Amino acid sequence: MRDELLEPTLQELLGLQRRPRWRPYLMGIVNATPDSFSDAQGTKSVEDRVELARKLLADGADIIDVGGESGITNKPAVEVAEEISRVVPVIEAIAKLPGAVVSVDTYKPAVARAAIAAGARIVNDVSGLLDDDLAAAAAEGNAAIVLMHTRARPKEKRFPPYDDVVADVKDFLADAVNRALAQGVPLEHVIVDPGPDFAKTPAQTIEVLRALDQLHELGRPILLAASRKDFVGALTDRGPREREAGTLAALAAGVDHGIAIARLHDIAAAADFLTVRAALSGELAVDDELALAEHKRRIELVSEA
């Protein structure tokens, strides 16, 4: 397991402060799409999305991940120009917020270049580096890149057979890292993602997450994107917007396995969960004078009269 969640070089590149091991960097999600599977925010305008980002930052987010194409498989891919028009105004505005570190969720090199020019510091690739030029775009823009495991193309729902899904994830990501390095990305700028749900059945995803420790053999920080995923729904028999408790359980397991970044919808719940968990485990010191503010002690009943 890594001594630091992120190396000082990557912390400096992204402008992030050091975090203790019990509290990974939290990546809040802002969808610049009309069709996200789990977006209940009603965030349709640039202003709406900036306000959501502001709230996520106030709730404890370290990074804001902006995406212009949803992962819904029964919808066509978004044209490059349309995706750029969705994400660039949002990224430009969020990047101006105090303390905001912006990531762009895209697999298209042209979108990545436009997003980096607009202020994104991370390229979050969910295609498994389908196009090596995406890594070149990150290198040119001095941005970090997240490389995710998947054996399916974007927008494709596919569950290929695996002889050993854990070994496949490790080998795939090792190859993706080497390809990124060949495009000029410094090793210190690479983050890996096991890709829960992507080209994996719920059982296969669970198998990979149980073995998350093995990904430390790659020598790179791990991003866990388990928020509201189908494997959580399969275990709990709940729809996307009802999976927060299951998401927090997955987050806890990820922290135990040494993840560096957690990509989440509900940042406030995750931050509170991690704080209480660390206090009870002894990882977070608790002042003897700790007390609850009186106005937060109970719900005030408001008369209907």
Regions found by a protein language model. Name each.
Residues 57-58, 176-189:
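Phosphate/pyrophosphate-binding loops at sites that engage ATP/ADP/AMP, CoA/4′-phosphopantetheine
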Residues 196:
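Active-site metal-binding loops of divalent metal-dependent hydrolases
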Residues 2-15, 21, 36-52, 71-93, ...:
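Active-site-adjacent loop and "lid" segments of alpha/beta metabolic enzymes
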Residues 23-25:
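A short, charged/proline- and glycine-enriched loop
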Residues 27, 61, 101, 121, ...:
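Hydrophobic "anchor" residues on beta-strands that sit immediately upstream
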Residues 51-67, 257:
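Catalytic domains of carbohydrate-active enzymes, especially glycoside hydrolases
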